[in-house]
Swiss-Prot record:
EC number: 2.7.7.18
Protein name as annotated: Probable nicotinate-nucleotide adenylyltransferase
Alphabetical UniProt keywords: ATP-binding, NAD, Nucleotide-binding, Nucleotidyltransferase, Pyridine nucleotide biosynthesis, Transferase
Nucleotide-binding listed as a keyword: yes
Pathway in which this enzyme or protein is active: Cofactor biosynthesis; NAD(+) biosynthesis; deamido-NAD(+) from nicotinate D-ribonucleotide: step 1/1
Function: Catalyzes the reversible adenylation of nicotinate mononucleotide (NaMN) to nicotinic acid adenine dinucleotide (NaAD).
Biological-process GO terms, alphabetical: NAD biosynthetic process
UniProt cross-references to InterPro entries, sorted A to Z: Cyt_trans-like, NadD/NMNAT, Rossmann-like_a/b/a_fold
Protein family: Belongs to the NadD family.
């Protein structure tokens, strides 16, 4: 019998409670053995002064999942030189773990963008995409996507960074403490 592993990719700048809830709900609803958090590089065109470094984002992820044995972090995309595509990452993971079925978890904003993903027609044959509802995004695309139910949330990392003074309720306590201690996103 194959293993069932979920993958939640993102910039996680910062990781917040909606990320944690997405992972928990996907694991529970799909019977996944574990969830891999896959932080990616912040594309050069997205780099804005005040964003956290790769190391800081990984440290915040570690704080968020601390004590949850079935949650792990995979940093391969941060280590890759040049562009990093999900297709390449999944090809590598499948080669390393041929006895595993991978479930790639994405929010509604990414479901809408899915047709534009690099090698998407091949990628949908390699993994099962899992879509999580998100307000104001369409979730109908020409690909098979397993949808999971989760209370809709409007939490986003961008909104948290832009309103960091009022963000504590959207963040795990240890992540909030880390942000304050390291004065990230303008938090003094």
């Amino acid at each position: 019998m194959k293993h069932k592993v979920g993958i939640l990719g993102g910039t996680f700048d910062p990781p917040h409670l909606a990320h944690l809830r997405m992972a928990e709900e996907a694991k529970k609803q799909l019977g996944l053995e574990k969830i891999l958090f896959l932080p990616n590089k912040i594309p050069p065109h997205k780099h804005i002064s005040g964003m956290a470094s790769s190391d800081e984002r990984v440290e915040m992820l570690q704080l968020m999942i601390e004590g949850i044995d079935s949650f792990e972090i995979d940093t391969r995309e941060l280590m890759r030189a040049g562009k990093s595509y999900t297709y390449d990452t999944m090809r590598d993971m499948i080669s390393e773990q041929p006895d595993t079925d991978f479930y790639f978890i994405i929010g509604g904003d990414m479901v809408e963008y899915l047709p534009k993903w690099y090698h998407i027609d091949d990628l949908v044959k390699m993994v099962t995409f899992v879509g999580v509802n998100r307000p104001s995004y369409q979730t109908e695309v020409p690909y098979d996507i397993v949808k999971i139910n989760m209370p809709e949330t409007t939490i986003s990392s961008t909104e948290i960074r832009n309103n960091i003074e009022n963000a504590s309720t959207f963040l795990p306590e240890k992540v909030w403490s880390y942000i304050k201690e390291h004065q990230l996103y303008g938090k003094k």
